[in-house]
Each structure stands twice: as C-alpha cells, then as structure tokens.
Amino acid sequence: MSQNADKIVDHFNLFKQPDYQEMFKNKQKTFENRLPADQVARGQEWTKTWEYREKNFAREALSVNPDKACQPLGRIFARGFDGTRPFVHGSQGCVAYFRSHFNRHFKEPSSCVSSSMTEDPAVFGGLNNMIDGLAISYSLYKPKMIAVSTTCMAEVIGDDLNAFIKTAKEKGNVPESFDVPFAHTPSFVGSHITGYDNMMKGILTHFWDGKAGTVPALERKPDEKINFIGGFDGYTVGNMREIKRLFSLMNVDYTILGDGSDVWDTPADGEFRMYDGGTTFAEAEAALNAKATVCMQGISTEKTMAYIQEKGQEVVALHCPIGVTGTDHFLQEVSGISGKPISEELKKERGRLVDAIGTSISYLHGKKFAIKGDPDFCLGVAGFLLELGAEPVHVVCTRGNKDWAEKMNALFASSPFGTGCHAYPGKDLWHMRSLVFTEPVDFLIGNSYTKYLERDTGTPMIHIGFPIHDRHHHHRYPIWGYQGAVNVLVWILDRIHLELDRNTLGIGTTDFSYDLVR
C-alpha cells in the first residue's frame, strides 16, 4: 500500500491515495449490492420532505439512533468518591464500551472491572463470578470501596446483588467491614441518567442506612452545611471546580457529593494515580446532617433527591442553569438556604457576562437553533438561547417525558423568542433529521454524534454536550456560573463568526463582507 516506514502518512491523507480509493470502490462493487445512484438519490430527497416527516413521526415500534446510552454507563459516572472501584456484574464487552466512552470524552483513563460473565453464568447464575471478581478487585487494585452494578445479562436472570455481596463477605473474599454499595442498573430500561441516579442513591443509602445491615443506621443531626450534586455532567471537571469557587466566594460550608473533578483529570507528573480525589467517606456520611441538598440536574437525580428529602433535608432541584437568569436563581437559592450574601466579586462577574452578551447580541438575535441532549441540559441551553435573543426552534430529547415537555413549553412561553419553538420528548435523531430538513435552522447544538446531522443536513453544529469525542479538552471548561455562561457564549459566537467567514470567501462576489473586525 501507499504507507511506508520512511514517511508515515496520517489516515486522513492516506485514504485519499489512489490504491485506497480503488480498494474502496472494489469493496462497494463486490460486497454492498448497491442500488443505482439515481435511485438512491431519489430516496434521499424524499426523506427530506414533509410527507416523509409525517410518516417518520408516526413510528411506534422502532427507534432510529436514539440519543441515549444505557444505565450501566451512567452508573460508571457516579464514581466521584475516594478510592472507589466501579464493578459491573456482567460481561467484559460491556465494560470495554463504558471505559472507552469515557476515555474518549475526558481523554483520561477510566478504570472499571467486570465479573466476566459468559454463557455459563448467564444460564446458571453469576454468583461465582461475583465472589471471584470481588476478591480479585480487592486484592489487585486495593480500592477503598467497590461500587457494584449490573448489566442486562445479570438482570435477565435475576441475580441478587445484595445476597451475592453478603455471600462474598461470608466466604472471606472481601472483609466484612469493607464498603460495597450496589445498585441494580438494567440496560433495557431507562438510560444513562437513570443509571447515574440509581448508583448515587445506592451509595448514599449504603452510608446512611447501615451499610446493608452490617452497622446501625446513621441518625440525622442537622447542621448548616449544604450538599451539592452535579448530576450526570460531561463538564464535571470544569463545573465542579467552578462550583467550589462560587461556594468559597460566598463563604458557604458545603459538601460535593460525587466529586469527579480530580477523578477525570489526573496530572501527568510522573506519578500514576489509580484513584484521585473524590468525596471522602466521612464527608458522605456527614452529608446526612446537611441543612439542604442542591442539585444542578434535578431530572437526572429524581430518585436520589427524593431519598434525600425523605431524610428530612430541604432539596433544591435545578435544571442545568446556564446564563444570567439560571446563575441568578442558583446563587439566590444558595444564599437563601445559607443566609450568606452573594459576594461583590460574583456581582462583578454577573456584570461582565451581561456586558459580553450586550457586545455580541447583534450576531445572536433571531438566530434559529436545534438542540439535542439530556433533559436538564436541554432546559439550560434553551433558556440561555432565549436570554440571548435566539430561538431554540427544535429541542429533541430522547429521555424527555411529558413533565419535561411541560417545563420546556413553560420556558418557551416566558419569552417572546419562544414563539414557534417546540419540544420533542421521546424522539430520536432520525426525527430530528426530518425537523431540520422541513423547518431549517441556522445551527445545531449537541454532542459529537450531532456531526452526522451536520453532514447530512448541511447545518453547522456547535459542540456542547456529552460525549464530545472529536474535540479536545472541552470538559475542562465550566458551563455553570457566570464564567461558564461566557464560555458557552464564546463557543456559540465562534461558530457563528466561522460561518460568516466561510460564506464570504468569494473574491469579488461575497468578500465585501469578509471583515477583519466582527
């Protein structure tokens, strides 16, 4: 082939070379049984019509590219506790997917183990796999805690995690006092946000309710602290550090539950850290006594927040607050609970954000957007766009339900820019394709998978969401707080200005607007 050891060519240029192009053509001709190009083109054009959109939206028993992942993946994200080893009772293949998915987003090792279930355990039960797996994980990786969850294989046959863990302790595979919280996370229902919610609740239940009956349940002794839960958040590295800064500026005594900021961002300083950062067990236990718990993504933590409320705490469930209004609401809630005033520094940061929006409003006003993502994320981004004078015309959320749609519609009704905007709960990316072709927008907002809609529809996209596989280091920047809103504003404006430049390149035709100053 064209590759040689003296001059290594990147795949982007390598696959353009004649021998590779010929190979691709031969594969298509020999194996793909392709229809004539004109017939394919006619079919493609028809799928862009209103007629096809009506048929597409009439689907009942088929999903085409749903915008969600499975519960166990979300469960892996709930690992922001000191020295915690995620343990999945299921196959190695499942865990390989979870690890690679997070590796590619955070550009960081994502350690996780499985019980290596195969055909025999799938028929006769996975008890022995669990017993051996816990013993190996404990002795080899030396964690402070092993957090166990399931996959569809273990759930279909009804494996009982609580009983299996107790048996492993009785056999001495792990010490009786060793922390092994668990959650059942079947892959065939819910989504990644459900899995995160189940695991967070499982970990808190373990610490607060007597560690599966091995110690007395904790008794709540209320104090003045505030707990904070970020939810399933692809920007957890930047966001958690920003939230800590905001709490510190207000002199608020707080505990982050599930702090993944260091877990997903270890330094390259010559020391390998299998475990880094995370909420300590003492902090997790003491969190029961907090005055209140504030969650930035209430929809993705419904069970966890309900459990915390049952313990007697005040709970505040927000929806990924981005922008001036969202951050105002968050800080006002924190101030009201803690009795601490919003600091002068934060008031200045608010003013800087307002100034930035005012500077750029002419480029944003009236722009139409299509958004896809998790329920709380969609609410937060749509709210910020309305604040900017933009129009979130299509908001598609596979994990959204009727309650989410009502929240979206109330948000649209709160702004004149929400007129003509629509929320689509339970819809997939093939639905979104029909929406963008029949009612075009100026920009798409979503995760890396949105790029295929960009290629198909010709609508430029802005990378915001989870996962971001094809861009680097976005997760290091916050999107919450006034500074986080500036980051989101810059990402949106950068793409708007890039499109302006691309559309004004024609020498003597469009370059009259190829401006040096925007």
Swiss-Prot record:
Substrates-to-products reaction catalysed: N2 + 8 reduced [2Fe-2S]-[ferredoxin] + 16 ATP + 16 H2O = H2 + 8 oxidized [2Fe-2S]-[ferredoxin] + 2 NH4(+) + 16 ADP + 16 phosphate + 6 H(+)
Lineage: superkingdom: Bacteria
One GO MF term attached to the UniProt entry: nitrogenase activity
Transmembrane annotation, as ranges: none
Required cofactor names: [8Fe-7S] cluster
EC number annotated for this UniProt entry: 1.18.6.1
GO process terms (BP): nitrogen fixation
A Pfam family matched in the record: DUF3364
GO cellular component, one term: molybdenum-iron nitrogenase complex
Presence of the UniProt keyword Kinase in the record: no
Role: This molybdenum-iron protein is part of the nitrogenase complex that catalyzes the key enzymatic reactions in nitrogen fixation.
Subunit structure comment from the entry: Tetramer of two alpha and two beta chains. Forms complex with the iron protein (nitrogenase component 2).
NCBIfam families found in the cross-reference section: nifK
Name the record gives this protein: Nitrogenase molybdenum-iron protein beta chain
